[in-house]
């Protein structure tokens, strides 16, 4: 069964673009190469400029655990920790149904 992970970062005021640049450098290539990811969305909160959320859909719970223990994820956590207000909120879910389609890249 596919599982989802929702991560919410509260960044220090004005740090959102810097956190995104670090994510783009360290995590995006790892996510693109990871066969365990079925879908991934990196999102900015519309009402709060200091909140970033990510939705990750994995093939199963083991794939999620494996990715969250990779060197790339560990490097990202270290690189952004001083830009965050505190640790991220992580919510794990069982995905009952989803629809995904390829979106054009910016």
Please name every model-derived segment.
Residues 6, 18, 79:
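Amphipathic alpha-helical recognition patches that constitute DNA-binding helices
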Residues 2, 39-50, 75-106:
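Glycine-rich beta-strand-turn "strand-cap" elements at beta-sheet edges
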Residues 15-17, 62, 98:
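Residue-level signal for secondary-structure boundary sites
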Residues 10-20:
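Short, surface-exposed ligand-recognition loops at beta-strand->loop->(often short) alpha-helix junctions
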Residues 3-10, 39-68, 94:
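Short, well-ordered beta-strand segments in beta-rich or mixed alpha/beta enzyme
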Residues 25-39, 57-91:
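An amphipathic, aromatic/His-enriched active-site/gating alpha helix that lines ligand/cofactor pockets
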């Amino acid at each position: 069964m596919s599982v989802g992970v929702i991560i919410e970062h509260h960044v220090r005021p004005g740090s959102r673009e810097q956190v995104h640049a670090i994510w783009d450098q360290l995590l995006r290539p790892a996510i693109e190469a990871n066969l365990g990811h079925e879908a991934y969305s990196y999102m900015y909160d519309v009402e709060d400029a200091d909140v970033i959320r990510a939705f990750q859909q994995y093939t199963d719970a083991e794939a999620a655990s494996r990715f969250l223990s990779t060197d790339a994820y560990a490097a990202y956590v270290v690189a952004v920790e001083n830009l965050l207000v505190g640790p991220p909120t992580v919510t794990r879910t069982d995905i009952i149904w989803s629809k995904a389609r390829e979106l054009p890249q910016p």
